[in-house]
Amino acid sequence: MKVSKIYTTIDAHVAGEPLRIITGGVPEIKGETQLERRAYCMEHLDYLREILMYEPRGHHGMYGCIITPPASAHADFGVLFMHNEGWSTMCGHGIIAVITVGIETGMFEVTGEKQKFIIDSPAGEVIAYATYSGSEVESVSFENVPSFVYKKDVPIKIDSYEFQVDIAFGGAFYAVVDSKEFGLKVDFKDLSAIQMWGGKIKHYIESKMEVKHPLEEGLKGIYGVIFSDDPKEKDATLRNVTIFADGQVDRSPCGTGTSARIATLFAKDALQKGEIFVHECITDGKFEGEVLSVTAVHTYEAVVPKVTGNAFITGFHQFVVDPRDDLNRGFLLG
């Protein structure tokens, strides 16, 4: 066997949504800010994303992360996230998993019963809190970037279907739609149809309008489509599944999507400040969310959302690349 590259990772999941944290084999990432570092990765390190996200080492639903030095003077560290299509601007389930893995493996030093972390992401500063007992993390909460409704009640016409979506930002831009518009339930049996509609809705919106953050040009485009449904469990508020990137299914309630959903509910007076919002996902996992404070992003009313969940480590891996392998960059099915 010939080996040209070796990568080490720690894998975890949050309500079934994977996160592969790359702990070894990453070259220097250049850039002063996390957005600049993201742009550098997109241009120079996309081979690394393909190797570790694609089959045979990953799969269509894999998600990844690189922990970087902080970009700002007061942050503890930075994060860069990746998926089947490229490099994302923020990832809520990723924050929950990174903090859990960091504490439970001794990567992060902690004191007391609750630890605060300041994290630089391409979307902005995120503050996370871990509640733990010894080396076991019980839950992680994060205060996300200011989240807001970009456009309400956007009319959509696809084939014979006419409906409306809300476009909201929660670290990335999402279109929010009721699954009942298509006669679908957020369940495994309807997932293929939901994926199909997710792709169509994303393509339609991006063909009709430019969606761009008012303060940061690097934050633009529809990242995902959130399909909302009635919950299965009595303690949940809503059920959802998010289709993002290239038809990728978020198994978790989606942290940035939950933040966007909190913003839409608050804007429609369906969620009050301090009220607990329980977001259920397709695997029946749950995130808790709430509005911590009200703020503004340029001319948009915004909220600072808090999202809480937990994660579990699934493995410690060492991946190699053999230069003789015609599939050493990987491939993607799905």
UniProtKB/Swiss-Prot annotation:
InterPro entries: Pro_racemase_fam. Induction: Is up-regulated when the bacterium is grown on t4LHyp or t3LHyp as sole carbon source. One of its GO terms (molecular function) is 4-hydroxyproline epimerase activity. It is an enzyme of class 4 (lyase). It catalyses: trans-3-hydroxy-L-proline = 1-pyrroline-2-carboxylate + H2O. Substrate binds at residues 92-93, 250, 255-256. The keyword Lyase applies. This is Trans-3-hydroxy-L-proline dehydratase.
